[in-house]
């Protein structure tokens, strides 16, 4: 069964590039440019994994991730991406149980590897 990945990214170029790469790897991809739309898509589609920018309009990624956990997505792997170098973000993501954390610009192959690994771990422990 094809796995579904939700990409929450407000930069259209990054969102499209990420979606194309994930689709080429065999995943079904949904995209949202803000946290509110991302929450709605998650609730309706129940993705297997979420890739989320930390800084988005209408919903800071960390807050959206916490809200998703509260709504029953505690076991859904989340990989964070960010252009920010603020101290404490990586730790905050880890405290939310992040499956990965990548600073932009990131290596697309490493991100894809983290997606594969998170989905395998999730599949075997579910």
Feature names for model-found ranges:
Residues 15, 57-58, 71, 86, ...:
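The feature encodes the CheY-like receiver
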Residues 9:
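Conserved acidic carboxylate
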Residues 106-116:
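C-terminal output helix
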Residues 34-37, 60-64:
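Acidic catalytic/metal-coordinating carboxylates
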Residues 16-24:
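Charged docking surfaces used in two-component/phosphorelay signaling
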Residues 45-51, 56:
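Active-site beta3 strand of CheY-like receiver
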Residues 63, 85-102, 113:
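Alpha4 helix (beta4-alpha4-beta5 surface) of REC/receiver domains from two-component response regulators
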